[in-house]
C-alpha cells in the first residue's frame, strides 16, 4: 500500500467547483500532512507486518526520517519501502535509499506511445506539486536569508503536523450516493 499525498488537488478543486460539491480532500496542506503522519502512526505496527507492505511515498526528508524512526522503534522496518519519483532530487533519493537499507522504489509513468499525453500530464502534475513553495523540495534548495530559513519553516510545519496528527478531521468530507445521480451516463445505463 502506497501512502501518498497531494497528487491531484488541482483536479479535485475543479471537480468540486464544476459540480458544486464540497471538496473531497483536506482544504490545507497542514491537515494533509497531519493525516499522513496519522496513517503512518496507525499502520506501522507489528500486528500488520505480516499482512501489508507500506510504501512511504515522499520527497520530504522529515517525513522519510519520521517513518524510518517509527518503523525502527516498532521493529517493522521489514514491512516498509521508501518510494520516490525517479529523477526528482537524485541526491536525496540516494540518501534515503541508504537509510532504508536499499529498500526504495523509484516510480515513473510508463505508457504506450499513443498515450504519451497521459505521461506528460502526470509529470506536469508532479512538477507542479513538487515545485509548490509550501513543499519540502523547493525549501531544500531555497536560499536562507537573515530573516527567513526555508528549512526551519519546513521543520516547524512538520512538527505541527506530527503534534496534531490525531486531532485533524478523520472521515469523508463529501459523500456520494450514485443511486441519486442524474446525467448522461446514468441515463445510458438505465436504457440498457
Segments from the language model and where they lie:
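Positively charged, amphipathic and often flexible ligand-engagement surfaces
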Residues: 1-185
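Tryptophan-rich aromatic "cage" segments
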Residues: 188
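C-terminal accessory/binding modules appended to enzymatic or scaffolding proteins
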Residues: 191-192
Amino acid at each position: 500500500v502506497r501512502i501518498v499525498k497531494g497528487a491531484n488537488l488541482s483536479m479535485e478543486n475543479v471537480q468540486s467547483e464544476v459540480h458544486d460539491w464540497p471538496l473531497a480532500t483536506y482544504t490545507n496542506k497542514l491537515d494533509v500532512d497531519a493525516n499522513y503522519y496519522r496513517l503512518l502512526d496507525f499502520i506501522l505496527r507489528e500486528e500488520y507486518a505480516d499482512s501489508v507492505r507500506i510504501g512511504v511515498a515522499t520527497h520530504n526528508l522529515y517525513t522519510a526520517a519520521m517513518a524510518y524512526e517509527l518503523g525502527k522503534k516498532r521493529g517493522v522496518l521489514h514491512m516498509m519501502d521508501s518510494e520516490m519519483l525517479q529523477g526528482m532530487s537524485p541526491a536525496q533519493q540516494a540518501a534515503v535509499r541508504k537509510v532504508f537499507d536499499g529498500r526504495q522504489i523509484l516510480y515513473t509513468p510508463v505508457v504506450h506511445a499513443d498515450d504519451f499525453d497521459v505521461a506528460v500530464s502526470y509529470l506536469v502534475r508532479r512538477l507542479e506539486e513538487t515545485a509548490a513553495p509550501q513543499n519540502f523540495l523547493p525549501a531544500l534548495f531555497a536560499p536562507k536569508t537573515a530573516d527567513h530559513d526555508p528549512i526551519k519553516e519546513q521543520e516547524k510545519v512538520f512538527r505541527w503536523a506530527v503534534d496534531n496528527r490525531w486531532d485533524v478531521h478523520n472521515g469523508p468530507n463529501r459523500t456520494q450516493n450514485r443511486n441519486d445521480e442524474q446525467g448522461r451516463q446514468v441515463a445510458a445505463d438505465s436504457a440498457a
